[in-house]
């Protein structure tokens, strides 16, 4: 069981590093740069489902929600604003950010946006739960 969990987490980390590395090194900007970082705590225990997807959101879209597992995001195009307990940040093309599991936050799409998203979800966990 621990070996399977370690393999899943290593795979997820490899995907995140690959996506971020590709964006940093493969973009129009030939200068390598840090695109985002943070402290990831509270990894899911046991096996996780690793889900990679592309999300397209229209300008003006808003949502206050939580995720069932850590969620890693790279902005492909457009601009989004994320507001949570730590403040408000604006992200644009090439930027990377993550959302810890269970942390309430709000996304506001400033211009039509396309995000590459990787989620680590414990079995049965909801990707996203809307909050009022």
How should each PLM-predicted stretch be described?
Residues 29-64, 113, 118-121:
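A short glycine-rich, His/Asp/Glu-containing loop-to-beta-strand
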Residues 30-35, 91-92, 96-97, 121, ...:
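All-alpha RGS (Regulator of G-protein Signaling) helical domain and cognate RGS-like helical scaffolds
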Residues 6-19:
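Hydrophobic membrane-insertion alpha-helices, especially the h-region
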Residues 68-85:
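Glycine- and acidic-residue-biased ligand/ion/polar-headgroup-sensing regions
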Residues 101-126:
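Ligand-binding loop in jelly-roll beta-barrel domains
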Residues 1-4:
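Positively charged n-region of N-terminal signal peptides that target proteins for export
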Residues 16-33:
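C-terminal region of N-terminal signal peptides and the immediate post-cleavage residues
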Residues 50-67, 88-92, 98-102:
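Conserved short histidine dyad/triad with adjacent acidic residue
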